[in-house]
């Protein structure tokens, strides 16, 4: 039996994680969520919620980049928070998307990554 492709989420927002989980599940991709980066599995696509606990999540991006150098690390936050987007990129994020674009971005990036067939 083949393993279900997985995408990871570092965050605790139930509404955003539910939206992300639903979008990915429709394409046969499982979302593995964890409140701390040391609990995330080794996957090639990681989403990081920058809407809360911002400083800790920025530090987590740096640790994730060190541990999973080739992973696509995607932060998400309010579209107007340009400074946070810049800081996330400086910390090692591959890109940062607006909250409202999260489900679409997840499907697009999972397809590029090869997670979605």
Range-by-range predicted roles:
Residues 10-11, 48-50, 77:
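Short beta-strand/turn micro-motifs composed of small residues
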Residues 92-104:
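Output/docking surface of receiver
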Residues 65-69:
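Conserved phosphotransfer cores of two-component systems
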Residues 1-6, 111-117:
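Non-catalytic signal-transmission and effector/linker regions of two-component phosphorelay proteins
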Residues 80-94:
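Alpha4 helix (beta4-alpha4-beta5 surface) of REC/receiver domains from two-component response regulators
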Residues 5-45:
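N-terminal first-folded block
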Residues 47-64:
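Conserved phosphotransfer microenvironments
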Residues 72-78:
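Short beta-strand elements of ligand-binding domains
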């Amino acid at each position: 039996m083949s393993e279900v492709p997985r995408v990871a989420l570092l965050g605790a927002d139930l509404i955003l994680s539910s939206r992300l989980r639903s979008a990915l599940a429709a394409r046969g991709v499982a979302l593995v969520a964890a409140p701390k980066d040391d609990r995330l599995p080794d996957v090639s696509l990681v989403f990081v919620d920058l809407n809360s606990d911002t400083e800790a999540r920025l530090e987590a991006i740096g640790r994730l980049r060190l541990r999973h150098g080739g992973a696509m690390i995607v932060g998400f936050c309010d579209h107007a928070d340009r400074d946070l987007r810049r800081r996330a990129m400086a910390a090692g994020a591959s890109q940062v998307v607006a909250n409202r674009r999260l489900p679409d971005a997840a499907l697009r990036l999972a397809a590029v990554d090869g997670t979605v067939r």
